[in-house]
Structures are given as structure tokens and as C-alpha cells.
């Protein structure tokens, strides 16, 4: 199938903000595709060429793409950069530049979806001394045959910035609609496999029954079950009846997979960080059985046995070089709290059974590997739960988790069966969409940041400017990132791609017509830069409203 047909779909999606229309457009297109193309489009429709959990990436920067565009249309990279600055986007710049194209490609064949998909995957395979030239050649081969509209979306895909307003939820609904399958079945398959290309093919070839057969596979990460804010401890314990109450650690949530003697470690965003944690791999090799499993836990950084801040473990996980040195500087501890797979899938088993099996298989002899500190919460043991909370705070942890002991593990769900009870003010994870440069001595820094939440259609809605909680080093870092993600600048105002996630604390939510959500935050303070999160992980307008109604 011609790539132009997919490009026409991209354009139609970009030109509507209505979720139902987007779903219908994608659904109609999916029905036209053979299985091979369907698997490719299941990824390309989200601007991806690999499943979310894959550690492969295109790895191409703006300058390389601009160089290739320049060669394709016969202008210098500086001219391309000027066009990007004028248009605010590489895709729109291509539309402008291709209209003035001075070079003509003779006997070129129309681009196909298959050719584009395979060419993009080749980009991830190129490394070494001559890799830059080889990558440019691959991009140039596509761009030289591309129309202006094809170049628009091709360059955006290479830079992983498709910008057509489509998220996983819309694609899920489109698959369900196209192949007449219940949305909940597609949703479960998505949470278990995190591969919409695979799901689309199974839906087409095997229908609802085939999707129901998809299950956990060690080596392929599953979206984590999520927690929401807990009401007072007695209220929630009385409601649950029996709860497992655990210390809430200030670290990075991990899924550790063992499959065929290989151990892989994934973050909550499905990022493979095995390379950064060799000592954790060694611990699991030595102190857990040599069976296939998926365990979940939290890894924290320590010093003299005491927990360090979240930023310390984040720096450690992000380290790509000198890992041995990092291991000495930032010792780690792992606290395990759930077992999703042991020889067979266990997520449909109640938490109590999963916890007991976890206790059976983990050898906690070394200090570096532990089970989460836990008490059973019942109406008769509320004092013990409150004592665990006080102990957790005294040990410099965040608070406690309260989980319904009778519940299965539901990937991707944020609900009342898993709750967090924290001492700190409640926070929201929000993405930066713009900012304002300071004045005077801070004129070179972006000093105030415009932050947004997701609505039900995955559109970003502004909620506040935040300007406190940032020291000079953090301002310098954020300003550098803002320039890297800049879309446009006017006076002191800057608009950026939604890439930077901030954890923001506040004293109160108030109604405000000034922002797109209809609400704002009183006394917002940046608590953390959440480098472990992306725009898909930020909080929602729905949660903001829920917090407003219950504050």
C-alpha cells in the first residue's frame, strides 16, 4: 500500500479534534489493510516503529533530519533551520520547502508503507564510525521520493513528533470498532502486551477469542497497576475489610523479568534499564529461583543504610557509562511487593496469594534485596497500620500503600483497590508546554513554566504557571531543555513540545477562567523533575476535578 494513503489518514486525523471522528477514520483504514501492513500501521499511527517496551530507537536528532531535508530539496541546512523556526515545526517546514524544490527526482517510485517502515527500522541498526552518513542516506532515499505531505509526516515520525492528536486509547477503540470486539478485551490485551501492531493483527485474524488468549509473557513488560490518593486510614481499611499495607518507598518502580535464564529490568514507562543495574541482575540470579517470573518492586538509593532522594536513584538509572563507578557511589536496595508471573501468569490471583508466593520464592539473606515492609490491615488492626505509616515517615520514606488483599492485578488501572497515603502535600505530574523568561539578572533563564494536564481525549489543557521550588542549577537545566524543545518564541514567551514533566505540589485547587482546565493551583511549587515520566504518564483533568471536589 502507498505511504500516501497513510499520510492522507494522518492529515484527516490532524484536522479534527473530535475523538469519535478520529476513531472512525482509523477504524475505516484498518479494514483496508493486510496483516503485514496492519501490524506496521498499528505502530506508525502512533508515530512509532517499535513497541513501547522495545529498547530499540531511531535515535536521530533535529540537525541530521534538517541536513537530509536540505539535500532532498537543494538548500542548505541553515535554510531548513530558518524554515523550521518560521513554521514552528519540521513537518510544516517541509511543506514550505518542497513547494520551492529545485531538484527533481526522475523515475522515482511511490513510497510504500512497507518500504518506509523497514527503512525507519534500518536507522536504529546503524552505528559506528560511518553511521551518520548511512543514516542520512537512508533518510534521503525516502525524502527524495516523497511528496511534500509525505515529507511532512515522515520527518515528524523520524523525530517521534507525529502531532496528530492520537493516543493509545483512540487506536484501541478503532481496533475494537473495526473488528467488532469489546473495548475492554482490546484494553486488556493492550495492557498485557503493549504492542498495538500485534493486537490489531490478532483482532483481524482471530477475533475476540484470540485477544483473550494473549497473556503475560516474561520479557515483555506490562503496564503497572496504579494508585490513587487514599482517604483517612480507618475509612479505607473498613471499606476494604482486609488490606495489605506497605511502606511507600521514594524510588523507581521496577518490573524484573526472568525468561530462559535472561533477566530484564523495566521501569513503569516500560523502559529497559537492565544495563544500568548489573548488581540487581546479579542479586536476582543468586537469590530468586531459576524459573520464569515477573516480580514488581521499588529500587532506592542509599547511603549508610538510609534512603536518599528520588533524584539520586534517577541519576543512577540514567547512567550509560562508568557503571562500576556509579555502583560504588550510589548503592541500591530493592524492595519487592508483587508477583505477576511465576511459571504461569498470576495476575488474576488475589493479592494475598501473590504476596505469599512471593515470600516463598525470595531469599532475603542479603541486605540489598528485601520484601516491602508490610502489615495486614483489618478493622481490628487500624492502629498497626497507623504505626506503619509513622514508622515509614520516620525512616524518611513517602508514606504507605494500602491495597485490597482480595483483588487481582489489573494492568494500567488507577482505582480504589490500590491507594497511597502520604505525609507530603498531594502533587500532580504535569507537562510543560511553555514558559516566560525572567528579567534582570535572570533574563537568560526561563523562570516561569506553563504546565498542562491531559483531558479524556488526550488533549493538553493548561492549569497553572509555576515559578517556585527551582534553584539556579535547576533553572539552567530546564532552560537548556526548553531551548532544545522550542517550537516558537515571541518576546519573553516560549512555546515548547510537551516533553518535560514536573511534579508540582500546591496548597489548594481553585476555579479559574484563566486556564483551559477552568481551574488553577494556589502556591504551586516544583517538587521534582520527573525524568522517568513522559506526556502519557501525566495526571488528568479528571483527577484535578476529583481532587477539587474532595479537598
UniProtKB/Swiss-Prot annotation:
Binding site for ATP: 246, 253, 268, 298, 337, 414, 420
Active-site residues from the entry: 248
Catalytic activity as recorded in UniProt: ATP + (deoxyribonucleotide)n-3'-hydroxyl + 5'-phospho-(deoxyribonucleotide)m = (deoxyribonucleotide)n+m + AMP + diphosphate
Alphabetically ordered keywords of this record: ATP-binding, Cell cycle, Cell division, DNA damage, DNA recombination, DNA repair, DNA replication, Ligase, Magnesium, Metal-binding, Nucleotide-binding
Alphabetical list of Gene3D superfamilies matching this protein: DNA ligase, ATP-dependent, N-terminal domain, DNA ligase/mRNA capping enzyme, Nucleic acid-binding proteins
GO BP annotation list: cell division; DNA biosynthetic process; DNA recombination; DNA repair; lagging strand elongation
Domain of life per record: Archaea
Keyword field contains ATP-binding: yes
CDD domains per UniProt: Adenylation_DNA_ligase_Arch_LigB, OBF_DNA_ligase_Arch_LigB
Enzyme Commission identifier(s): 6.5.1.1
UniProt GO MF annotations: ATP binding; DNA binding; DNA ligase (ATP) activity; metal ion binding
Cofactor requirement: Mg(2+)
PANTHER family: DNA LIGASE, DNA LIGASE 1/3 FAMILY MEMBER
Function: DNA ligase that seals nicks in double-stranded DNA during DNA replication, DNA recombination and DNA repair.
HAMAP family for this protein: DNA_ligase
Family from the record: Belongs to the ATP-dependent DNA ligase family.
Protein name: DNA ligase
Organism of derivation: Methanobrevibacter smithii (strain ATCC 35061 / DSM 861 / OCM 144 / PS)
The organism's taxonomic lineage, starting at the top: Archaea, Methanobacteriati, Methanobacteriota, Methanomada group, Methanobacteria
Amino acid at each position: 500500500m502507498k505511504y500516501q494513503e497513510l499520510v492522507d489518514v494522518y492529515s484527516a486525523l490532524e484536522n479534527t479534534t473530535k475523538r469519535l471522528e478520529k476513531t472512525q477514520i482509523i477504524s475505516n483504514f484498518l479494514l483496508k489493510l493486510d496483516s503485514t501492513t496492519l501490524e506496521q500501521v498499528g505502530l506508525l499511527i502512533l508515530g512509532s516503529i517499535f513497541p513501547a517496551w522495545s529498547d530499540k530507537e531511531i535515535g536521530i536528532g533535529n540537525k541530521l533530519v534538517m541536513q537530509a531535508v536540505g539535500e532532498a530539496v537543494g538548500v542548505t541546512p541553515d535554510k531548513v533551520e530558518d524554515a523550521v523556526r518560521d513554521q514552528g515545526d519540521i513537518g510544516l517546514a517541509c511543506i514550505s520547502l518542497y513547494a520551492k524544490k529545485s531538484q527533481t527526482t526522475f523515475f522515482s517510485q511511490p513510497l510504500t508503507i512497507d518500504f518506509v517502515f523497514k527503512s525507519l527500522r534500518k536507522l536504529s541498526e546503524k552505528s559506528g564510525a560511518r553511521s551518520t552518513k548511512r543514516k542520512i542516506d537512508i533518510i534521503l532515499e525516502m525524502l527524495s521520493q516523497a511528496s511534500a505531505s509525505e515529507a511532512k509526516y515522515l520527518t515528524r515520525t523520524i523525530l517521534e513528533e507525529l502531532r496528530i492528536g492520537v493516543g493509545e486509547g483512540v487506536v484501541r477503540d478503532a481496533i475494537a470498532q473495526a473488528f467488532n470486539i469489546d473495548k475492554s478485551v482490546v484494553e486488556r490485551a493492550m495492557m498485557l502486551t503493549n504492542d498495538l501492531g500485534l493486537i490489531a493483527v490478532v483482532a483481524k485474524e482471530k477475533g475476540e477469542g484470540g485477544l483473550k488468549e494473549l497473556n503475560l509473557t516474561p520479557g515483555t513488560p506490562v503496564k503497572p497497576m496504579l494508585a490513587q490518593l487514599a482517604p483517612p486510614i480507618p475509612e479505607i481499611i473498613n471499606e476494604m475489610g482486609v488490606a495489605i499495607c506497605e511502606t511507600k518507598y521514594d524510588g523507581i518502580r521496577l518490573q524484573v523479568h526472568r525468561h530462559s535464564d535472561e533477566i530484564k529490568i523495566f521501569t513503569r514507562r516500560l523502559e529497559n534499564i537492565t544495563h544500568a543495574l548489573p548488581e540487581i541482575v546479579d542479586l536476582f540470579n543468586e537469590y530468586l529461583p531459576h524459573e520464569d517470573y515477573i516480580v514488581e518492586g521499588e529500587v532506592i538509593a542509599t547511603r549508610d543504610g538510609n534512603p536518599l532522594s528520588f533524584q539520586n536513584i534517577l541519576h543512577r538509572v540514567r547512567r550509560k557509562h562508568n557503571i562500576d563507578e556509579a555502583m560504588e557511589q550510589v548503592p541500591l536496595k530493592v524492595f519487592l511487593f508483587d508477583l505477576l508471573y511465576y511459571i504461569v501468569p498470576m495476575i488474576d490471583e488475589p493479592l494475598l496469594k501473590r504476596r505469599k508466593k512471593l515470600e516463598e520464592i525470595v531469599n532475603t539473606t542479603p541486605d540489598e534485596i528485601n520484601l516491602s515492609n508490610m502489615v495486614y490491615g483489618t478493622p481490628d488492626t487500624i492502629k498497626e497500620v497507623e504505626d506503619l505509616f509513622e514508622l515509614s515517615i520516620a525512616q524518611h520514606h513517602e508514606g504507605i500503600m494500602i491495597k485490597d488483599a482480595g483483588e487481582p492485578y489489573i494492568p494500567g488501572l488507577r482505582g480504589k483497590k490500590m491507594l497511597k497515603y502520604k505525609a507530603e502535600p498531594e502533587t500532580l505530574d504535569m507537562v510543560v508546554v511553555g514558559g516566560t523568561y525572567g528579567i534582570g539578572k535572570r533574563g537568560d533563564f526561563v523562570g516561569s513554566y506553563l504546565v498542562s494536564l491531559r483531558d479524556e481525549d488526550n488533549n493538553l489543557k493548561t492549569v497553572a504557571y509555576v515559578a517556585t521550588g527551582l534553584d539556579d542549577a535547576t533553572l539552567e537545566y530546564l532552560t537548556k531543555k526548553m531551548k532544545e524543545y522550542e517550537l516558537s518564541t515571541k518576546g519573553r514567551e516560549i512555546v515548547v513540545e510537551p516533553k518535560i514533566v514536573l511534579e508540582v505540589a500546591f496548597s489548594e485547587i481553585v476555579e479559574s477562567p484563566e486556564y483551559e482546565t477552568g481551574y488553577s493551583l494556589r502556591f504551586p511549587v516544583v517538587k521534582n523533575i520527573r525524568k522517568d515520566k513522559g506526556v502519557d504518564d501525566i495526571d488528568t483533568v479528571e483527577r484535578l476535578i476529583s481532587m477539587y471536589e474532595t479537598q
